Amino acid sequence: MEFFYILILIILYFINSQQYTPVYDIIGNISLFNIPITEDKYYETVIDSLIELMENYAFIKILKSPPKVNGSDYFNKVDIIQDLKNLKSTINETTPNFYEFYQDISKIIASSQDFHIIFTYIGQKAPFDMLGKLIISSPIEIFIKKDKKVLANLNSVIYKLNNETQVKNSDIISNYYKNKTYLTKINGKNVYQYLREFCADYCRYKSKNSKFIFNKVNFGGFYLWQCPLTFDELKEFSITYENGLTLSSNYIGFIKNSQNDNLKNTELSFNNFYNIKNKFFEEPIITSQEKENKVTWDINIDNHIKCKVDHKNEINVIFQNSFNPNPSDPLGIINNFSYCHGNFSNNDYPLIVIESLNGGGFAQLSKLMQQMVQDLMYPKNYYSVIHNKNTKQFLYDNKDSFIFVNDYETNNLTIDEFYNDIVSEKYGNITIERSKQKIAVDLNFESLIKNNIFKRNSTKKPTDIIIFTDGLSFSSTSVFIKNVYYFGGAILVGYSGDPEAELFDASQNPTFVLTNLTGIKGFIELIKRGFYFPRIPSGAMYRTKYDINNENIPEEFTVNLIDERINIYNDYSDDLYEDFISEAKIIFEKYKKSCNPNNKYLNFLNEDCSFAEGHLHGGYKCGDDGTWNKTCVPFYCDEEYYFEPNEKKCIPLKEIKRDSSDNSISFAFLFIVLGVIIVVLIIIIVYYKRKNKNELDLQEIKEELMQN
């Protein structure tokens, strides 16, 4: 859950909104804290604490021998625990400087390729808090044209932070952008290759496209703790244009003009990292090249959720980049989904969904999105927990958030029944034990279904729905995209990302973030030493379409390829609206007759297809020749039933039975949110009350938390 992170961001934002002071001598400032920490066994304690936490990571063993993709090594093969132990052994021989230590340990964590793992240093006192304060911006921002050529403009971030900042060769850079003189190299490397490598050691995403996006955004501006580049990497760099001119330029650093720095505690995910920049700088970092086109949306919630019925183009449109609710109106996002769904249901227009830099959020909102976009399907998510050190306790800690059930059964399983139904699996020479995957029922979502918030009002054909994804689509966004994909409920279209990438994964990291580390000693030890609320996910999602008895690969390690890719290589902004509409029209027309022969999930709905079972409906699948096979195949059911894909039959929806203690479960969402907020604020208060002390007593912290 990332709701409380957003709350902290907003609170801290309003506390302090002063201007930033430019730092031209970045290396000199970093050198201030590039010294050994004098606390006895500091580095060893940090590593031991991190090992204790990582022992609970869902994929800690699988990463030693991850599944292959199309016979090749697509995922990192790493032994994180051993790498941490190796780092500790080198520390015993030579005491590192703090910055070098932070670089080393950050690379090890990043090798997991999992952004759900939170491990962030914010510092306790000068000079080490500089790592949490310093923002670094390149002098240029990158725009990739449809023909894949690159333009470079002066970085708008710099002037929003301080409009008096001096950028070397700024006049030439600005004029070349206006005259459309294209950039060919950065530091002597092809621009694309440079962006692939920039900050790559610290990028925790799996797909190449998402890494490219992450690096490209970071190139525009990043926090030093997020991307601790070497001194050589932070020196002046060169840019070369197509006419042969090479200019030297420089990074600019910024520090907030306040002791109450509101940046060091904030960016805990890519989504929050990007959105908080919008908060500070008022408009996106990657600004649009043209601002003439103004889109009037029927509803626009903080530029996170926007939808409209475009009568001119006869298309329904929804844009989204977050599944996080507004802290002041946590149920408002559900009402907005309902509003959009109601408007879309009143016409027969096709629908496009634009996912842009979506870092996820609440899983139940992802499920609502699934039903809003494709209401022929009934969302079901299969989850498992890996049997690691504390995962059973995590289940008990989260028992009020969800329940587990077997297929088609009305009685929920006890935690012991779920946890002790064990599956043993081998990955190479690695054996893991986990619980057998079951359907996870989000209690709040079930109450929403019961109230028929998204009752089926019309039947949208899968070929009349396009999901535009930049490939970064992360966490609960990935759950949304994967479930629609496996149902065959929409055409997946890729944009943005690496223009030269051959493989385009539609989404990534649909991890079941089941964790509560506050009872683990290592968690407290890390907070005492300046690290911000570490998080280690312990659950895994499994695909819903296959026989669960034969499916043993977590969705974390599967790749879902897009159906089409368009030549839009920048993040979505409203000036690109008409481009997306134009591309959608072409694709909708194409899929009336043609299809992607590599996607055997996508369905072509044909209402003339009839089946012996009265509630069953279907259509066609794509043939190997890239046209629709005219053989009728069932894939959906009447409302109040859900489609069972293995037996190809309709199962009546039944309300999940609950214990008497669950009578107030429809309010679980609000209570969970409120509880998380209180706990986080208490931890913050406890931490800052004690941060200036050299020693923090672990038992005292636990007692204070329990009393509160």
Spans of model-derived segments:
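Flexible, low-complexity junctional segments that flank or bridge functional domains
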Residues: 18-410, 466-467, 506-515, 582-585, ...
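Extracellular, cysteine-rich, disulfide-stabilized repeat modules with beta-strand cores
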Residues: 600-603, 614-630, 641-648
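Disulfide-rich extracellular modules and peptides
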Residues: 205, 597, 611, 624, ...
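Single-pass type I membrane-protein transmembrane alpha-helix
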Residues: 673-690
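Extracellular juxtamembrane-to-transmembrane boundary of type I single-pass membrane glycoproteins
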Residues: 654-673
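Conserved acidic, small-residue-rich alpha-beta core segments centered on
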Residues: 362-578
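Membrane-proximal cytoplasmic juxtamembrane segment of single-pass cell-surface glycoproteins
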Residues: 685-705
